[in-house]
Amino acid sequence: MLKKLTTALLACTAFALPQAFALSVLPEAGVSLGVGTKEQYAEAKVLPRTTIGYKRADRDQYGNQNAIYATYNVIGSKVQLLGGWRNNIDEQSSSTSFYGGIGIAAPHILGLQPYATYVKGSHFAETQAGLNYNIAFGWGLNINYHNYMPEDGDNEHGVGAGVTFHF
């Protein structure tokens, strides 16, 4: 069942554009806090098309990575450019990396929003495909599949889940 769900999510987004982090779509203003299986983040909408944030990711083999990032809405909030700086990348030739990428989100359907992201840094690449669900009163649920590919070492991939609160 999970394999079919993951395949369906990838198929829905693959036709839009080539496809990691959970792509949240903030309203015109606000702050979003989230915690997931492998990460915690906080982000804020600072301009109508720009969001900045901080993310802490727990990597099995590579320690706890910190990222400071920004997203820029290119086409509404459905296509976003992603960029940032990540540190504490263990076992790499350098422990820091600037990165950039793209995020694509489909329109909401019955409170569900599929998305996919791809980011590439000088020492890693990461993809994520997932599904956001708006529960109520600013609360949301996220289910995703991520694939973290370091320059040196083994890939880390798996299914994750998380909750988000927008205020």
Describe the residue ranges of each PLM region.
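Repeated loop/turn-to-beta-strand initiation elements of outer-membrane beta-barrel proteins
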Residues: P48-Y54, I75-G83, P107-P114, I135-I143
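Residue-level signature of outer-membrane beta-barrel architecture
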Residues: A44-V46, Y72-V74, N87, I102-H108, ...
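Short glycine/proline- and aromatic-enriched beta-strand/turn motifs that initiate or cap beta-hairpins
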Residues: Q19-A67
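Outer-membrane beta-barrel "beta-signal"
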Residues: D154-F167
